[in-house]
Structure formats: structure tokens, C-alpha cells
């Protein structure tokens, strides 16, 4: 039986830091970001289903979000100002991402490939799935900005403003609900969010 390097590669997502051009109070890696995006994407899907008549598979959305940046283990996390410097660079980077996604899929044993390929290849996502994962991705980047700003790091002021515009462009009922119910707590200290806890 042939060995696969697939999970050994994915394990290295924890070595790739996000926001590489920014001074960070706390460094965030791609692995922990992916977990947070999965949790938020799952919540958005659940909110959509429960509150707004949606019919999406929240567990699949969480899985897609877990793998949404998997190709960065081969490409690295390119800083946003570089990635979107102009349309040509953005287009070329998308092509590089596609190649990296295919390379990861090719690492999976053939008998399992049909399970993992639709998780890694974003072209297999439905429009609704892609929208929910992108909303969650932007929300988590926004939450990172709030955390950095709360810690006194003004380096993230412009990023927060840019992400507010992104969130507005991707706005949905489920995102509005999440922003109203869950996001305000990110402005609070540990003591403040623990006041109601019996522990």
C-alpha cells in the first residue's frame, strides 16, 4: 500500500502565519483560523436554516470551511495587498491555488479521493456553500481585527475598515444575526464575558 503525505502536509498549516505584513499582538496561524472559520460557517448555516428558512447542510459547510485554506500549505498565505494588487495578479494567484488544490487531492489515496476532492476543490462548492464559507472567512478576519484593536494594536484599524466593506458586500440575514448576537462580546474582556458564568 502506497503511503500518502496528505495529512503530513495539512499538519503544517499550523506553521503558516496569517497577516504576515502586520504587527500582531498575537500571531494567528492558518490551522487555528480554519477551525474558527469552520465553527462560524457552521453557525451561519444553522442560523440560516433555523431562523430564515434555509435548507443547507451545516455539517458539510463546516467541513468545507475546515479545508478552505488547505492549499496554503503549498502556496503560503499571500498578504491581501499583494494578492489583490491588480486583477492580473489576483487571476494568476487563483490559478496557482487551483494547481495547489489539485496537487493536494492527488496526494489522497485513489479510493478516498472522491471524499476529499469536493472539500478541497472550491469549484465543487455550490454558490450557497461558497457564500457561507466566504462570509465566515471574512467574519473571522474581522474578529481578529477586533481582538488586535482591543489589545491596543492600531495596526489593524485599516484592515477593520476594509473588512467592514467586505462584510457589507457579503451581507445576509444570517450574518446580521451573528453580528448582533455574537460579535459584541469580542469587544469585552475575559472578566466581562465571564460575569454570568457560575464557575
Swiss-Prot record:
Ligand binding (substrate): 18-19, 33, 69, 77-80, 137
Name of the protein described by the UniProt record: 5'-deoxynucleotidase YfbR
Main location class: cytoplasm
Keyword hit for Cell membrane: no
Enzyme Commission identifier(s): 3.1.3.89
Quaternary context: Homodimer.
Example GO BP: dUMP biosynthetic process
Annotated effect of mutating residue 122 to A: Shows reduced activity and affinity compared to the wild-type
Cofactor binding note: A divalent metal cation. Highest activity with Co(2+), followed by Mn(2+) and Cu(2+).
Chain positions of site Appears to be important in orienting the phosphate for catalysis: 18
NCBIfam families, A to Z: PRK03826.1
Gene designation: yfbR
Residue intervals of the HD domain: 30-142
Entry GO terms, CC: cytoplasm
UniProt cross-references to SMART domains, sorted A to Z: HDc
PANTHER family given in the database record: 5'-DEOXYNUCLEOTIDASE HDDC2
Entry's family note: Belongs to the 5DNU family.
InterPro entries for this protein: HD/PDEase_dom (IPR003607), HD_domain (IPR006674), YfbR (IPR022971), YfbR/HDDC2 (IPR039356)
Description of activity control: Inhibited by both ribo- and deoxyribonucleoside di- and triphosphates.
Superkingdom to which the source organism belongs: Bacteria
Entry keyword set: Cobalt, Copper, Cytoplasm, Hydrolase, Manganese, Metal-binding, Nucleotide-binding
Species name: Escherichia coli (strain K12)
Role noted for this protein: Essential component of the deoxycytidine triphosphate (dCTP) pathway for de novo synthesis of thymidylate. Catalyzes the strictly specific dephosphorylation of 2'-deoxyribonucleoside 5'-monophosphates (dAMP, dGMP, dTMP, dUMP, dIMP and dCMP) and does not dephosphorylate 5'-ribonucleotides or ribonucleoside 3'-monophosphates.
HAMAP family (UniProt xref): 5DNU
Cofactor section: Co(2+); Mn(2+); Cu(2+)
